[in-house]
């Protein structure tokens, strides 16, 4: 079997999602050098894997789609032709946008849990505790996915 195809099928089996959606995580991970399992864990924590999820925040902003992209990112995403509707209706666009946002935090903070926490809570010092809680939530799910990867669950097709 061709290695990229094998990887895609394994990813789809682990995620228990269509190969198309698994491919979205794989493509975004490759493009931004982020483990696709980490992106999947973020989507699980953010939206419960609901591509139509929407959350209105107390500060007036909105979190949109599978990766719960905050509306404060919409002006920057508009430069790429991405609008709120795209994030709500196109799960792959949401995954790619989420990976881009996380990659920007990685550039600023390094590839670590501070960047993951900043994905949800930003970088303001008064949000340290919120960043840490969020990173712990993502880590808990990510660790389970890593364990399944190590245990060979990629081949079994079991749900993460």
Language model: regions and residue ranges:
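Positively charged n-region of N-terminal signal peptides that target proteins for export
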Residues: 1-6
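Bacterial N-terminal signal peptides
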Residues: 7-16
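Catalytic glycan-binding domains that act on GlcNAc-containing polysaccharides
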Residues: 15-160
């Amino acid at each position: 079997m061709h290695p990229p195809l094998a990887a895609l099928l394994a990813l789809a089996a682990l995620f228990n999602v269509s190969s198309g959606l698994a491919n979205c995580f794989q493509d975004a991970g490759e493009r931004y050098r982020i483990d696709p399992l980490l992106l999947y864990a973020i989507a699980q924590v953010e939206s419960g894997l609901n591509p139509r999820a929407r959350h209105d925040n107390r500060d007036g902003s909105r979190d949109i789609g599978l990766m719960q992209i905050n509306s404060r990112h919409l002006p920057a995403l508009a430069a790429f032709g991405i609008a709120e509707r795209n994030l709500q209706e196109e799960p792959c666009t949401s995954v790619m946008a989420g990976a881009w946002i996380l990659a920007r935090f990685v550039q600023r903070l390094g590839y670590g849990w501070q960047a993951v926490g900043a994905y949800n809570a930003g970088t303001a010092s008064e949000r340290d505790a919120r960043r840490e809680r969020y990173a712990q939530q993502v880590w808990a799910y990510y660790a389970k996915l890593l364990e399944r990867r190590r245990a060979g669950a990629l081949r079994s097709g079991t749900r993460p």
